């Protein structure tokens, strides 16, 4: 029996939200490109970027010349991209899980570390 080849995986770490819309939008553009190439794409939101996972928040993030964040995030999730959130970051901002997008998954540091160690590349925005 032939050994199944492991799928390539890229993690996009996002640390900016509405404070820097371009840096919030670009990782989702790149992650969508990875998914189109059949590469597993995982976006991890840290710090203030966790706000991007609040229901409706993405509707208000725009950067000149780039597609709207709302469309990029919807496409990312529809293609099977995974959206992970820093649990302490959402707790610090007093964001309840009911306020988050359904597909957003809060994670602890150990899970984040496992994801990073299993990836072919980790990009930070």
Regions found by a protein language model. Give the residues of each.
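A glycine-rich helix N-cap at a beta->alpha junction
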Residues: 60-87
């Amino acid at each position: 029996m032939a050994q199944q080849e492991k799928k390539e995986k890229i993690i996009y770490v996002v640390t900016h939200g509405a404070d820097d819309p371009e840096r919030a939008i670009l990782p989702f553009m790149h992650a969508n490109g990875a998914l189109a190439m059949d590469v597993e794409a995982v976006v991890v939101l840290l710090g203030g970027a966790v706000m991007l996972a609040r229901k409706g928040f993405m509707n208000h993030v725009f950067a000149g010349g780039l597609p709207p964040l709302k469309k990029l995030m919807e496409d990312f999730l529809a293609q099977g991209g995974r959206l992970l959130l820093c649990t302490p970051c959402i707790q610090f901002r007093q964001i309840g899980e009911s306020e988050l997008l359904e597909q957003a998954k809060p994670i602890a540091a150990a899970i984040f570390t496992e994801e990073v160690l299993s990836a072919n590349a980790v990009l930070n925005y």
